[in-house]
Amino acid sequence: MAQSTTYSRVLGTGSYLPPNRVSNQDLAARLAKQGIETSDEWIVARTGIHARHFAEPDVTTSDLALIASQRAIEAADVDPQAIDLIIVATSTPDFVFPSTACLLQNKLGIKNNGAAFDVQAVCSGFAYAVATADSFIRSGQHRTALVVGAETFSRILDFNDRTTCVLFGDGAGAVVLQASDEPGVLASALHADGSHSNILCTPGNVNGGIVQGSAFLHMDGQAVFKLAVNVLEKVAVEALQKADLQPEQIDWLIPHQANIRIMQSTCRKLGLPQERMVVTVHEHGNTSAASIPLALDVAVRDGRIQRGHNVLIEGVGGGFTWGASVIRY
C-alpha cells in the first residue's frame, strides 16, 4: 500500500496595519522641517509608493503580530490550542530576547508548550518561515503552524536620509498552515550570499548598554536593485521547477512589496501579465517580512485568490537572502 504524502495547507490568512497612515505629502512635510527636500512625485516615480503606516511609539511588533494572528486563526477556524508551532519572521523584534514568537504565544493564550521561535531573513523572512514550517509539518514533527511576518521598521529609519526613510512601513501578516492530504505548499527554494551583507543592513550594535555604530537602516539602493532583479527570477524558476509547474500555470504572483520597478521586472521575466501580480506597495510601502503575508491576505479577502489557485510568493532581503514558495491555496 502506497504511503500518502503529507502537505502543509493554508487554512486561513490575516493581516494588520497600524491606523496611522502616512502619505508621501505627510512625509515630505516632516522632512521639510529638517531642511530635507522630497515630494510625492519623487517618491512615486522611483518606488510606486504613495503611503505607508507607522505604529505608535508604545506599539510593538508583537502587538501587530497579535492582531494579524487572531484574524488568521479566525479565518482558519482552528482552536488556538491546536497550534503547536509558531514562527515569526521579523528584523524588528520587541527585544533581543525572548523571541517575538514566544511573546506572541503568550499573548494568544496558547498553553500547549508548542515550539515558538523567530526567523531573521529581513525581507525574505516570510518565505524562509513558510519553508521552515512546511518542512516541520511534512516531517510529522508538528501539525498546525502559525507563520507570521511582522515589522516596526519605522523604529530603525533615519529620517535624515530621504533615500531610505520614504520606503518602509510597519505592519503584520499571518497564515495558519496545517497538515493535509491535499496539496498546499508545493515547493520552496531558499538561498543566501553573505558577501553582500553590507548593501542592506543596520551596522550598529549594542555593547555594554551603548549603541556602537549606526542603529539605523543603511542601503545601497543601486546594488540592491541590481541583485534583486537577478535572484528573484532565478529563485522563482527554481521553485516552479521543484513544483513541476510552468510560469503560465501560476494564477497569482506575490513578490516582496519593495519597489514597483523590481516587482514589474520579475513579472515580465516570468512572462506573466502584470494583472496576475498582487500589488500593495503603493499603500503599504516596504513592510519587510510582513509584505508578502499582508498582500496575500488582501488578495484572499477581496476574492482574487480562490481555493485551488497556484500562488507564487518570493522575497529578497538583507543578508543577502532570497527565497520563494509555490502554494496551492
Curated annotation (Swiss-Prot):
Q: Where is the active site?
A: C123, H256, N286
Q: State any GO CC term.
A: cytoplasm
Q: Where in the cell is it found?
A: Cytoplasm
Q: Which GO terms describe its molecular function?
A: 3-oxoacyl-[acyl-carrier-protein] synthase activity; beta-ketoacyl-acyl-carrier-protein synthase III activity
In terms of domain of life, where is this protein from? Bacteria
Its annotated pathway reads: Lipid metabolism; fatty acid biosynthesis
One Pfam family assigned to this protein is: ACP_syn_III
Q: Where is this region: ACP-binding?
A: 257-261
Cytoplasm found in the keyword field: yes
Q: Give a yes or no for keyword Transferase in this entry.
A: yes
Which reactions are catalysed by this chain?
A: malonyl-[ACP] + acetyl-CoA + H(+) = 3-oxobutanoyl-[ACP] + CO2 + CoA
Which residue windows are transmembrane per the record?
none
Q: Which GO terms describe its biological process?
A: fatty acid biosynthetic process
| InterPro entries listed in its UniProt record | ACP_syn_III_C (IPR013747), ACP_syn_III_N (IPR013751), FabH (IPR004655), Thiolase-like (IPR016039)
Q: Which UniProt keywords apply?
A: Acyltransferase, Cytoplasm, Fatty acid biosynthesis, Fatty acid metabolism, Lipid biosynthesis, Lipid metabolism, Multifunctional enzyme, Transferase
E.C. designation(s): 2.3.1.180
Q: Which family does it belong to?
A: Belongs to the thiolase-like superfamily. FabH family.
How this chain assembles, per its entry, is: Homodimer.
Concerning HAMAP family, the annotation shows:
FabH
Q: What is known of its domains?
A: The last Arg residue of the ACP-binding site is essential for the weak association between ACP/AcpP and FabH.
Q: What does this protein do?
A: Catalyzes the condensation reaction of fatty acid synthesis by the addition to an acyl acceptor of two carbons from malonyl-ACP. Catalyzes the first condensation reaction which initiates fatty acid synthesis and may therefore play a role in governing the total rate of fatty acid production. Possesses both acetoacetyl-ACP synthase and acetyl transacylase activities. Its substrate specificity determines the biosynthesis of branched-chain and/or straight-chain of fatty acids.
Q: Can you say what this protein is called?
A: Beta-ketoacyl-[acyl-carrier-protein] synthase III
Organism of origin is Paraburkholderia phymatum (strain DSM 17167 / CIP 108236 / LMG 21445 / STM815)
